[in-house]
């Protein structure tokens, strides 16, 4: 049976082993944007919601306007454009609804108040039919564009996605010639962690078409996006097969791999997997220059932290006998019953369980092993949930 590569396990861990890390968005607040010539401004007021949680709860239940306080029937954000008169007073030109359900993320107003442009939606950058919305000087919508109106489907797939958003652009600006320039993130085929590079998408404000995209630079960017998107699709298919397949220990003896294995083994094996999570600690090779830190983490996990009724999982890059010796030495300082109520999982052969139980006996912890050589099948309910996404 082929071992599952750890980089796939890490992908599974991110998506399934624990709750996903949600984006952190502050509640939408009123914002004011001023034209380049400082004579026009727009105030954008979000639609009131009781809380982000109420908004998303109502969305799931199909209630609209989602998250609205009792008695509020507004369904859209509003914009008010004002002009600075010679006397120094701001005079209202128009006020009306925008296309955004709660609020846009950013906005621009042109000199003379001729155009208002909004970008994205609160808590969902890159999604929706109005990632860009262009309005004329009277508040009439000229055009709303989805991200797919600006870049290809492969380009979108190749961009970085968070739980709520697509990281697709930099800071846009307007030109005196009546154009909107949006720096579009160019996917990198080599290193997603390096600083982002951008390529300008240009839109004509008067009627909203994208007038860029045919240059050699854009053609190269789209070719790169196609390559990255194909890689992601291949990776997702491999991750899917890894999630479905029985789990074995990592084929490469690295710290990152073992963390992934411990997490996935816990969620496949523990009867309490729905209600608990596990900490993971990996003892490094004693010859590694950074070994000492990992022994400190091992000591902290066993003695220093309050793990009452907690769950801990351990693995070792070092030989198993060395790991056992270090654990015995650390637990020599443990008080009787110090880990009572805790569950300890160790990546080790099944035959090592009696030895490990003896070592932990005075602590009161319950000890289990994840045998890397024994395949752990996927839970049917996790598998059903996973496959239901397709």
Where is each model-derived feature located?
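Blade-loop segments of beta-propeller domains
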Residues: 88-113, 118-120
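Aromatic (tryptophan-biased) beta-strands that constitute blades/sheets of beta-rich domains
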Residues: 54, 62, 66-100, 133-163, ...
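Acidic, small-residue rich beta-repeat scaffolds with periodic aromatic anchors
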Residues: 21-33, 158-243, 373
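Short, solvent-exposed loop/turn segments at conserved positions within beta-propeller repeat blades
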Residues: 69-77, 124-129, 192-197
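N-terminal signal peptide c-region/cleavage motif recognized by signal peptidases
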Residues: 17-19
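Mature extracytoplasmic domains of secretory-pathway proteins
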Residues: 111, 142-152, 284-343
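N-terminal, charge-rich interaction modules
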Residues: 230-299
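Short beta-strand elements that form the blades of beta-propeller/WD-repeat-like
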Residues: 37-73, 113-125, 178-187
């Amino acid at each position: 049976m082929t071992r599952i590569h750890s980089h796939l396990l890490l992908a599974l861990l991110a998506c399934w082993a624990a709750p996903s890390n949600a984006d952190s968005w502050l509640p939408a607040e009123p914002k004011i944007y001023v034209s380049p010539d400082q004579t026009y401004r727009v105030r954008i007021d979000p639609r009131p919601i009781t809380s982000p949680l109420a908004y998303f709860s109502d969305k799931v239940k199909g209630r609209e306007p989602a998250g609205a306080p009792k008695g509020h029937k507004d369904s859209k954000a509003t914009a008010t454009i004002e002009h600075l008169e010679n006397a120094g007073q701001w005079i209202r030109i128009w006020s009306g609804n925008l296309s955004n359900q709660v609020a846009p993320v950013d906005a621009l107003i042109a000199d003379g108040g001729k155009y208002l442009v909004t970008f994205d939606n609160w808590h969902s950058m890159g999604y929706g039919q109005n990632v860009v919305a262009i309005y004329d000087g009277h508040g009439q919508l000229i055009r709303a564009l989805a991200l797919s109106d600006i870049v290809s489907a492969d380009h979108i797939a190749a961009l970085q996605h968070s739980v709520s958003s697509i990281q697709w652009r930099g800071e846009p600006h307007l030109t005196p010639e009546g154009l909107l320039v949006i720096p579009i993130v160019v996917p990198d085929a080599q290193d997603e962690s390096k600083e982002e590079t951008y390529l300008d998408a240009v839109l004509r404000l008067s009627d909203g078409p994208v007038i860029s995209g045919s240059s050699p630079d854009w053609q190269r960017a789209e070719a790169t996006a196609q390559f990255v998107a194909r890689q992601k699709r291949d990776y997702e298919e491999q991750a899917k097969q890894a999630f479905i397949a029985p789990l074995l220990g990592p084929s490469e003896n690295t710290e990152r791999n073992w963390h992934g294995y411990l997490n996935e083994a816990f969620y496949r094996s523990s009867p309490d997997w729905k209600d608990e999570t596990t900490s993971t600690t990996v003892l490094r090779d004693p010859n590694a220059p950074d070994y000492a830190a990992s022994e400190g983490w091992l000591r902290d996990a066993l003695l220093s932290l309050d793990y009452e009724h907690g769950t801990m999982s351990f693995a070792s890059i070092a030989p198993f006998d060395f790991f056992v010796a270090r654990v015995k030495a650390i637990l020599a300082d443990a008080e009787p019953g110090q880990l009572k109520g805790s569950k300890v999982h160790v990546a080790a052969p099944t035959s090592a369980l009696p030895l490990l139980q003896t070592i932990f006996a005075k602590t009161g912890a319950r000890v289990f092993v994840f045998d890397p050589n024994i395949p752990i099948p996927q839970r049917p309910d996790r598998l059903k949930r996973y496959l239901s996404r397709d």
